[in-house]
Amino acid sequence: MADKEAAFDDAVEERVINEEYKIWKKNTPFLYDLVMTHALEWPSLTAQWLPDVTRPEGKDFSVHRLVLGTHTSDEQNHLVIASVQLPNDDAQFDASHYDSEKGEFGGFGSVSGKIEIEIKINHEGEVNRARYMPQNPCIIATKTPTSDVLVFDYTKHPSKPDPSGECTPDLRLRGHQKEGYGLSWNPNLRSCLLSASDDHTICLWDISTVPKEGKIVDAKTIFTGHTAVVEDVSWHLLHESLFGSVADDQKLMIWDTRSNNTSKPSHAVDAHTAEVNCLSFNPYSEFILATGSADKTVALWDLRNLKLKLHSFESHKDEIFQVQWSPHNETILASSGTDRRLNVWDLSKIGEEQSPEDAEDGPPELLFIHGGHTAKISDFSWNPNEPWVICSVSEDNIMQVWQMAENIYNDEDPEGAADTEVQG
């Protein structure tokens, strides 16, 4: 009986999702300046823009690149580098190019040929997460379904993978007992990598001292303060010895690598009422960070007084797995997760007065809801070169590259585009 009810619930949910998607598609020309939807061969659990951009002469687009991965059904997995053509500001937009079937928009008409897979490198099992080293973006670290963290220099691998399927990373980083997701390169110290694991620990490697023989590097330090699965880890963006971690023990911990005590963090705070899945330090303000949780909220913190939560962002209907500050705007951050939505928040709007109608849509700081995905969002990334452009990937193979309409984030609109809180 329960099976029948579950099947009925699933069917109802699927119908609701499809209806919502149809509405979203119809509204994209009003809500976005750009939407590109691309079906990947396999879903990617990870997405990160590379920092480089090329602007071909005489063309009305620029070429950006992404680090992706695969999550296959028992077939060969790959670490993937893809290229994406984004239209320039002066590209000739033509409303007739709106593809209502796909909900694609932005003067480009069809996306075919605009997103291409450039490099595929054999990988052991799915790519849980992949992140490039800021000081040398050719170096990419990956989290695997095993306890190993792999490091690839993609310039040393052919762009087409060896048909044997053999995975030949340039380094294997050892120290964990189980798999995990969290991965963070130190932006201020070259070659220093942190990783979070289901084994309750955080490992730190320095890959500048590469072994003479073999490819195995053992962890330099193992941090053991958490009492449950460590979900995410992140270096502070300005202080080379500080990092934060979050875990299923509901705690946010701040660590200092200069301390000799690897089992006790500098600060530990009960951050949420459920598992804490992600964290992000603000790139502009050295004291501010955000955490995202299974309690459906994003929390805002000040390192100077962690006893007091600055703010709680509430609108998500399910677990939050990603939170990322905008690289271009100090007050903007985005979050995503199981509810298939990516929310963009603006701190500067916290506490603004709202009409009752607006309040029904969400709090004033909720700037935008991206509703283009019909499955759980696995990861997203802010484009470092094009403000307000985001790439998001979901469990149903879909990758979307999108930019909300300018009148939503630009308050200078004389026609009073004050009703900026829109739902995709």
Swiss-Prot record:
It comes from the Eukaryota. GO terms for biological process: chromatin remodeling; DNA repair; DNA replication; DNA replication-dependent chromatin assembly; fin regeneration; regulation of DNA-templated transcription. The keyword Transcription regulation applies. WD repeats lie at residues 32-125, 126-175, 176-223, 225-270, 271-314, 315-371, 372-404. It is found in: Nucleus; Chromosome, Telomere. Keywords: Acetylation, Cell cycle, Chaperone, Chromatin regulator, Chromosome, DNA damage, DNA repair, DNA replication, Nucleus, Repeat, Repressor, Telomere, Transcription, Transcription regulation, WD repeat. GO terms for molecular function: histone binding. One of its GO terms (cellular component) is CAF-1 complex. The modification N-acetylalanine is found at residue 2. Binds directly to histone H4, probably via helix 1 of the histone fold, a region that is not accessible when histone H4 is in chromatin. Core histone-binding subunit that may target chromatin assembly factors, chromatin remodeling factors and histone deacetylases to their histone substrates in a manner that is regulated by nucleosomal DNA. Component of several complexes which regulate chromatin metabolism. Belongs to the WD repeat RBAP46/RBAP48/MSI1 family. This is Histone-binding protein RBBP4.
